[in-house]
């Protein structure tokens, strides 16, 4: 016989008479599953999507830490919390947190370069510098600026520094042509030993005092380090440590 004792949430039967909870009541008590706002797809060595990571409708932490919503525990190039992707609403927003190895976005159209911007071409990490913004060294004794080395050649408007181990400058390339080409086989700045760099990979151009970076249809793409919060579009490609991820906006 069914009594009128209310059944507490989470219980399947009445503790007094043993009557089971009705299906309609059970359905009303069931928590709603977390809404999937989109996903990140890991790109494998063949360029195919492999693992798919759902994005919750809110903030999603990415990094090496186990408390991240999307964790890559074995990637030593990532910080505990490397960046945060907000999928609360469209467009999605990405906020970088790591100050060492950085978060990169693959460029699909020409982008303007600014002093200090970091570029990834293949395995190469390159820092762009404007000549007029380079600071001369300062004497530790007098505090005055020092002029080190030879005077800068006429017509030079920029410099690209190749960053090596320990974040030290391995090579420096002066930019004086309006278009400076980067590649493995053809161009002004070559990386012949980097198999991830295309024969002709990218170009840095100076136009009217402004500088632009353009990918030349390379196989593996050209990436620019994200310095501040940005918006993301569907199919954008992110590079975090050793992980290449494609953004999918909206539930599958």
List the model feature ranges, each with a label.
Residues 103-107, 131-133, 138-140, 222-226, ...:
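A short, polar/proline- and glycine-enriched secondary-structure boundary/capping micro-motif
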Residues 194, 251-252:
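Short coil/turn segments at secondary-structure boundaries
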């Amino acid at each position: 016989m069914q009594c009128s004792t209310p059944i507490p949430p989470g219980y399947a039967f009445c503790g007094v008479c043993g009557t089971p909870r009705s299906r309609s009541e059970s359905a009303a008590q069931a928590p709603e599953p977390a809404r999937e706002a989109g996903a990140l797809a890991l790109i494998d060595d063949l360029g195919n999507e492999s693992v798919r990571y759902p994005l919750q409708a809110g903030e999603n932490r990415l990094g090496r830490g186990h408390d991240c919503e999307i964790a890559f525990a074995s990637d030593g190039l990532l910080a505990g919390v490397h960046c945060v992707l907000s999928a609360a609403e469209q467009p999605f927003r990405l906020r970088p947190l790591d100050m060492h190895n950085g978060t990169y976005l693959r460029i699909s159209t020409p982008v303007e370069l600014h002093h200090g911007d970091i570029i990834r071409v293949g395995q190469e990490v390159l820092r762009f510098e404007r000549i007029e913004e380079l600071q001369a060294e300062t004497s530790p004794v007098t505090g005055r600026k020092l002029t080190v080395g030879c005077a800068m050649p006429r017509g030079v408007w920029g410099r690209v520094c190749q960053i090596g181990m320990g974040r030290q400058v391995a090579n420096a390339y002066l930019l004086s042509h309006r278009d400076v080409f980067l590649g493995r086989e053809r161009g002004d700045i070559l990386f012949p030993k980097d198999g991830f760099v295309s024969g002709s990979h990218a170009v840095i151009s100076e136009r009217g005092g402004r500088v632009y970076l353009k990918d030349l249809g390379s196989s593996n793409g050209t990436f620019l380090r994200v310095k501040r919060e940005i918006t993301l579009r569907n199919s954008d490609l992110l590079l975090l440590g050793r992980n290449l991820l494609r953004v999918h906006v909206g539930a599958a």
